[in-house]
Structures are given as C-alpha cells and as structure tokens.
Regions:
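Feature captures outer-membrane beta-barrel proteins of Gram-negative bacteria and organelles
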Residues: 1-5, 37-48, 60, 91-101, ...
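Transmembrane beta-barrel domains of Gram-negative outer membranes and organellar outer membranes
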Residues: 1-87, 91, 99-102, 137-139, ...
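Transmembrane beta-barrel strands of outer-membrane/channel proteins
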Residues: 10-12, 58-64, 109-115, 152-158, ...
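Outer-membrane beta-barrel domain signature
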Residues: 27-30, 80-84, 116-121, 152-153, ...
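A short secondary-structure junction signal
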Residues: 70-75, 104-108, 121-124
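Active-site lining segments that contact anionic ligands and/or coordinate catalytic metals
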Residues: 149
C-alpha cells in the first residue's frame, strides 16, 4: 500500500484436478478447474528501533479471514464454519528484530503467537519462530553481487518446520521463492512486487 505500516496481499491458488480425483468430475481431470482466493493483511504497530535501537518491530496480522459460502448465495463465512472455503485462516501477533554484521549480512529473528482456525485442519493457539539471513557482501565482484540477492530462511510455523530461500533478481521487484514444507514437500514460485511508494 502507500502506507509503510500496512501490507495487504491477494493470493490466488489455482486448483488442478488430478486424474482419478473423486472430487472433480472426469471431464475436468488434467485441467485447472477451480481457484481459491484469499486476502491477508499486516499492520505494523511498532517500528523496529523507534524508541531504542534494541526495540523490535511488532506486527498484527491475519490471513484468509473470510470467504463466500461454498454453496453460493454470496454470504460471508469465516474460519472453520460450515460452508466456508477458509483453508488458511490464522491471526497472529509477531515480533521481529534484525542484527547487522558489517560486510557480511543481516540476521533476522522472528517470534509470533498464532491462532490458527483453518477449515479442515487442526486448530491451535501456540507460538511460532523463524530466522533468516540476507547476505550483504561488499559488491567488489560478480560473485558477491550475486550472493547479495540471497535470503536463507528457516521456521517453525506453529505446525511444521520449513526451510527455504528467496532470491531477488531485480531490486526486490522479481523474486524466486523455494521451500521444503515440513522438510520434505517442495513448493516454489516467482513473486512480482509492485512498490506503490
């Protein structure tokens, strides 16, 4: 958004009907037949270093809070209620602190309390933790310039342990993201960012 303290995201997941699916009719097998749309938002309550250099950033966020009923009709439903499509509903309060290592990079430490209320999944109220390291070598060679686009990540998201990386190709406008969810399930993609400010 145009406000540095507010982040809003729209996620559209295309659903592929696999051959032999018992949910989708046979004529749709092998095709993308549906989509799941979700919004998320993060509100920065406190900026890192506002009061003292050591103070962390504090963020309040939500993912996939409501959807239209899966049977049509246009009514809004939330969380694990009957008829919802909220497969990623969660609310969280997060704290983040970054430490700079001159001519090497920046280490981020993150902790949150998460309330998960997604449809068809275990509901939980528990902490999550993460860490990342973004390289920041002096740009004296092509290798150090290339390494500076790399951000290594690891997390416990209140349900699973995940490891991955993000690589920025062009000034944080185009990023490659890859992850092993629960240490074994690969997911990846390209992220295109539009900076409004």
């Amino acid at each position: 958004t145009i406000f540095p303290w507010l982040e809003v995201s729209y996620i559209c997941t295309l659903v592929h009907a696999d051959h032999g699916s018992t949910y989708f009719p046979e004529q749709s097998w092998g095709k993308f037949t549906n989509q799941d749309r979700a919004f998320s938002a993060r509100l920065r309550l406190w900026k890192e270093g506002w009061w003292k250099e050591w103070t962390p950033q504090i963020v309040l966020g939500l993912d996939d809070p409501t959807s239209h009923a899966d049977h049509g009709g246009g009514e809004l439903v939330a969380g694990n209620t009957s008829g919802s499509n909220n497969y990623a509903t969660r609310y969280y309060l997060a704290v983040t602190k970054h430490l700079n290592f001159q001519n090497i990079g920046e280490w981020g430490v993150h902790a949150a309390f998460v309330y998960g209320n997604a449809k068809g999944m275990e509901h939980y109220k528990r902490p999550s933790f993460g860490t990342n390291f973004r390289f920041a070598f002096p740009e004296t060679s092509i290798i150090s310039k290339a390494a500076n686009g790399l951000n290594l990540m690891a997390e416990y998201d209140a349900r699973t342990c995940n490891v991955g990386f993000e690589y920025s190709f062009w000034k944080d406008y185009v990023n490659l993201v890859a992850e092993l969810n629960n240490g074994k399930y690969f997911s990846g993609g390209l992220v295109f960012k539009v900076h409004l400010k």
